[in-house]
Amino acid sequence: MPKASVTRQIAREKQKLINFVLDIEKYPEFIPFCIDSKVYERNDHKDEIAIIADLTIGKKPFVDTYKSDVRYNKQDDTIHVTNIGGPLKHLENNWKFIQKDKFTEVRFDVDFEIKNKFLDMIMTKSFQYGLNKIADAFQKRAEKI
């Protein structure tokens, strides 16, 4: 199972960045390999925002859709994502947002495994490259908001 972390410093307010990450419907506009997204459910509670969403990812001929449970904890400004359906055997990623003087530090941790062993082996080899491309895309788009 590939595991990795990326930390970026982005010159934006923490809450703007949190809202940006939670705007899942816009992911296909700027995230590499993200073809489509659909939010099925969004509930705003006192302590958290809970979202159920699909992301369609890939590059032909390998395209698939997975369903995620996304939880934003308002108390500690974290977003926790887990897989609840699709081609992934396991997915867990976490976002942490820390406001600094002139920027927000954003930490993204990801851990996943694909059910198909052949695809998992391919993805593992290009995982860090893909993760950096996605982190770059998030940062570039976030700096425009």
Functional labels for PLM-detected ranges:
Residues 1-48, 102:
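Hydrophobic ligand-binding cavity/cleft-lining segments
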Residues 1-5, 111-118:
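A short small-residue
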Residues 2-6, 51, 66, 91:
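Structural detector for hydrophobic anchor residues on beta-strands
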Residues 17-20, 27, 53, 70, ...:
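Hydrophobic pocket/interface hotspot
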Residues 20-23, 49-53, 75-81:
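Short Pro/Gly-enriched beta-strand edge/turn motifs at strand-loop
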Residues 23-26, 62, 102, 123, ...:
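Amphipathic alpha-helical protein-protein interaction surfaces
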Residues 28-29, 36, 41-43, 56-103, ...:
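Hydrophobic-ligand binding "helix-grip"
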Residues 113-145:
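A conserved amphipathic terminal alpha-helix motif
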